[in-house]
């Protein structure tokens, strides 16, 4: 039973880490990345559709994304969806492709993004600690109901703390990686 609780805790902590990693991938950093467009939906004949299902998205060498729709009539729809997304980018429609230029961010913008990244990582750490709290509560209930001995509970707490430390450290690593990505130019 103890192992099942640990396994459940690890699974939930891993999901929290993956969610934070995904949030970081959608964050704007000043560097062109197709991932920034993944959440944007375009009205495709009445159906909200992700841009990457309507076009190819390439990173060009001049700090821009090139969006080449498979149907030319989608250019204006893609342009409108990007403008509505509040990414802070202005799409340029040249009749064949939509181009998104990524200007070099100011130091102030980068510091703001680092602060936002830190908040996201902190949110992830809080989620991991909440998982620890919930699982520990279950284990203490088991000990109270004589399903687990006091010694088993103590060992369980130590193992759970190691697991928690591992995933909190993982959140810190994700943040440091994102911070480095934001600040490097």
Swiss-Prot record:
Any one GO CC term of this protein is: cytoplasm
Which of UniProt's keywords are assigned here?
Cytoplasm, Protein biosynthesis
Q: Which GO terms describe its molecular function?
A: ribosomal large subunit binding
Q: Which SUPFAM superfamilies match?
A: Ribosome recycling factor, RRF (SSF55194)
Q: Which InterPro entries does UniProt cross-reference here?
A: Ribosome_recyc_fac, Ribosome_recyc_fac_dom, RRF_sf
Q: Where in the cell is it found?
A: Cytoplasm
Q: Name one GO biological process term.
A: translational termination
| Residue stretches spanning the membrane | none
The record's section on PANTHER family has:
MITOCHONDRIAL RIBOSOME RECYCLING FACTOR PSEUDO 1, RIBOSOME RECYCLING FACTOR
What is the documented function of this protein?
A: Responsible for the release of ribosomes from messenger RNA at the termination of protein biosynthesis. May increase the efficiency of translation by recycling ribosomes from one round of translation to another.
Family recorded in the similarity comment: Belongs to the RRF family.
Name-wise, this protein is: Ribosome-recycling factor
Q: What is the lineage of its organism?
A: Bacteria, Thermotogati, Thermotogota, Thermotogae, Kosmotogales
Which gene is transcribed and translated to give this protein?
A: frr
């Amino acid at each position: 039973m103890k192992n099942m609780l640990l396994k459940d805790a690890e699974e939930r902590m891993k999901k929290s880490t993956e969610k934070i990693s995904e949030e970081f991938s959608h964050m704007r950093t000043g560097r062109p990345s197709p991932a920034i467009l993944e959440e944007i939906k375009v009205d495709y004949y009445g159906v909200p559709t992700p841009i990457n299902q309507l076009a190819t998205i390439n990173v060009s060498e001049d700090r821009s994304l090139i969006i080449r729709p498979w149907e030319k009539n989608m250019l204006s729809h893609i342009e409108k969806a990007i403008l509505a997304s509040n990414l802070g980018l202005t799409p340029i429609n040249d009749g064949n492709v939509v181009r998104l230029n990524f200007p070099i961010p100011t130091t102030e913008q980068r510091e703001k993004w680092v602060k936002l990244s830190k908040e996201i990582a902190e949110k992830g750490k809080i989620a991991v600690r909440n998982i620890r709290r919930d699982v520990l509560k279950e284990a203490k209930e088991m000990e109270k109901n004589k399903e687990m001995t006091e010694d088993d509970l103590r060992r369980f707490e130590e193992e759970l703390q190691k697991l928690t430390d591992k995933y909190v450290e993982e959140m810190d690593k994700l943040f440091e990686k994102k911070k480095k990505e934001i600040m490097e130019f």
